[in-house]
Amino acid sequence: MEHTTQCKSKQGKPCDCQSKCGCQDCKESCGCKSSAVDNCKCSSCKCASK
């Protein structure tokens, strides 16, 4: 299930949602649509109510 944390952004660049991307970056760049596991693991992004 490693592919859930490593996803590609819309520009094709690899995006590590656990360490590199903020929660909003994870959603916008990596294509996550909710805080659940989608294209990447957004639940791993430290996301407060921002």
UniProtKB/Swiss-Prot annotation:
The keyword Manganese does not apply. Keywords: Cytoplasm, Metal-binding, Metal-thiolate cluster, Nucleus, Zinc. One of its GO terms (molecular function) is metal ion binding. Its main location: cytoplasm. Zn(2+) 2 binds at C15, C17, C21, C32. Zn(2+) 4 binds at C40, C42, C45, C47. It is found in: Cytoplasm; Nucleus. GO terms for biological process: intracellular zinc ion homeostasis. GO terms for cellular component: cytosol; nucleus. Zn(2+) 3 binds at C21, C23, C30, C40. Belongs to the metallothionein superfamily. This is Metallothionein zym1. The lineage of its organism: Eukaryota, Fungi, Dikarya, Ascomycota, Taphrinomycotina. The gene is zym1.
